[in-house]
Amino acid sequence: MSSFEERERAEEAKFAFDAELRFKAEARRNKHLAYWACDEIGIESANDRANYLAEVITADLTEAGPEDVVVKIKADFEAHSVQIDEATIRTKVAEFDELAKREVIDEAK
């Protein structure tokens, strides 16, 4: 095998590894967001929290990026008369995104 082929395989492996880390970080971000939203809405039982997490995960499958999750959480806050605006939700998305990335990278070490 030539050094070019070895380098190509290494780059492909790194790309796959990075994609897996991104996927795990997005899933972790959504988990943090869902549980934060549960706290704000007042969802307390473990079963209800798990169901809400599943709803957030399903919402995230609609389109790339966190936009669909923001829309879902905002609608849920409005439905439960929670006075948290979209800007605050987006701030939480950014915070939890960074937290999730750090957690996933630390676990991968």
Please place each PLM-identified region on the residue numbering:
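A charge-rich, low-complexity, intrinsically flexible signal that marks solvent-exposed coils, linkers
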Residues: M1-K109
